[in-house]
Amino acid sequence: MPLIVQQVEISLARLDAFTDGTLDQCLIERITPMAWSPLAAGLIGEGASRLLPSQEVYRPEKFLPALDGVAKGRGVSRIAVALAWLLKHPSKILPVLGSTNPQRIRDAVKATEFELTREEWYQLLTAARGEPVP
């Protein structure tokens, strides 16, 4: 039975899958990547109530100003932009979300109502990396 889905931590706060070959393999093998913690344990929204030890490396302060700029320009929340950023990737990343907050769920749905430009996408990637993209 072929592998058709791979769940991996992917977000603006966790870029490993972009550089370690994970998303490249997904594209080549036609595997759908599912992003767990796509909002960095809530840090991309209003903040996290608690982080897992592996999530203590998150540094949202690097990219939140750029994320807020794109969100303001589009008239949507940073949650919508962060998820739209994942959805724009050619590997067709599927974010795995969980929330009991109705507004966060509405914000997440907004991500499917627009598409980031290539410039916006790379602006966010550059901010998240903390250095220019080669």
Regions found by a protein language model. Name each.
Residues 1-134:
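Beta/alpha (TIM)-barrel catalytic core signal, keyed to glycine-rich beta->alpha loops juxtaposed to Asp/Glu
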